A protein has these predicted regions:
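RNA/tRNA-interacting regions in translation and RNA-turnover enzymes
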Residues: 1
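Conserved NTP-donor binding/palm subdomain of two-metal-ion nucleotidyltransferases/polymerases, i.e.
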Residues: 5-241
């Protein structure tokens, strides 16, 4: 289960609340944390958008504050969830992050397809296109959308904006079928028996391979991703050694 606590003050309170229960908390790259709660693995994320380009953070922060959430009533209680626009951005940037690391599986593609179907007609497609262009990942999103339509059979009408018709998704679907869920089945970088748990054999080889594949479609993210991951590793080491 993944939980997002996105404002700095709130994320600090959430960490203290969990730590006070006595559960073992593991820090992850990307300023996230994981722990086991009643037999369920929980991931806490501090960022609503997995965007690693630091020059976009001011723009994204102001955008986030303006478009943060909408209210949903569950069992008579009002809870806040991400707005439809932010849900699109959050899911797709999260998938891109994993694609830049060790790859993704069919499950992650279904996440995007589900969002498109659920929020069909509720998002301004032109505004979403503008944001993707600003983030420098528009071409990558077009490949992702082409894959959903061309290989998974999702009706093109559910897309938030039209396909460009210029992007070939064959390279992406081939990688999805090769690596499996989060890259644990990629025999190019270690056998299945080697890639178990949360550790992968020859992780550097996999990272470099996915960098080369994606850099033409999301250049800034592909370049900043390994740098920011390394920074978060160092930060966690210095804070919690």
């Amino acid at each position: 289960m993944q939980i997002g606590v996105f404002r700095k003050k709130e994320s600090g309170k959430a960490y203290k609340l969990i730590a006070d229960t006595g559960v073992t908390i593991k820090r992850q790259a990307g300023f996230s944390m994981t722990y086991q709660w009643k037999g369920c693995l929980i991931e806490h994320h501090k960022r609503v958008l997995d965007v690693h380009n630091p020059f976009l953070h001011t723009y994204l922060h102001s955008f986030f504050e303006e478009n943060y959430c909408q209210e949903l009533v569950l069992d008579g209680k009002v809870v806040n969830i991400l707005s439809p626009l932010l849900t699109h951005l959050s899911v797709n940037t999260h998938i891109l992050k994993h694609m830049l690391a060790f790859g993704i599986g069919i499950r992650q593609l279904c996440d995007t397809a589900s969002v498109y179907r659920h929020y069909y007609g509720e998002v301004d497609g032109a505004e979403l296109e503008k944001i993707y262009h600003k983030m420098g990942i528009y071409r990558w999103i077009q490949v992702l959308n082409a894959l959903l339509v061309g290989y998974l059979g999702m009706p093109a009408d559910f897309l938030p904006f039209p396909l460009s018709g210029n992007e070939d998704a064959e390279w992406m679907i081939e990688d999805v079928l090769q690596v499996g869920n989060f890259g644990f089945y990629d025999k190019r970088f270690g056998s299945k028996s080697m890639n178990t748990g949360t550790r992968r054999q020859n992780a550097i080889g996999s990272l470099f391979h996915h960098f080369k594949m994606n850099v033409c479609y999301a250049p800034a993210e592909a370049c900043w991703f390994p740098l920011m991951q390394a920074c978060s590793h160092v930060s966690n080491f210095l804070k919690f050694r």
